[in-house]
Amino acid sequence: MQHWNAIQRLHGRYSKEVNDVLKPKGLSKSQFDLLMTLYHQESATQKSLERTLELSSGAISQTVKKLLAEHLVIRKRINREKRVLLTEQGTKLIQTSAPEIEEIDDRYFRAFTSKDHETFDQLLHKMQSDHF
């Protein structure tokens, strides 16, 4: 129980810091994550976004609708597939927001050695594969 409480406190603190960066830009964390995914993949189907982000089809659909309304993404048919792509405005927003989020991430892991990172990754993988 002690570990879960520590994880919850850490997650709460991290989430607050991330939201403090994203909120003034009009973004939620799930919107940011979707935009980052598109930034790295160029385009994606809603189904692939569901798998990558581990969100329900309804959550992805709502997030995409909000981002469409803000002109941060567009839908486009490519090779018979409906895909979601970043707009120029979406790309610029990610390019300015991502470094701020990376700075927060770096602060949380600054004290880790490379061995610590490796061990941490192994433990997370073990927890996920054993229980999910």
Descriptions of predicted regions:
Residues 118-132:
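Exposed, interaction-prone assembly regions rather than primary DNA-binding/catalytic cores
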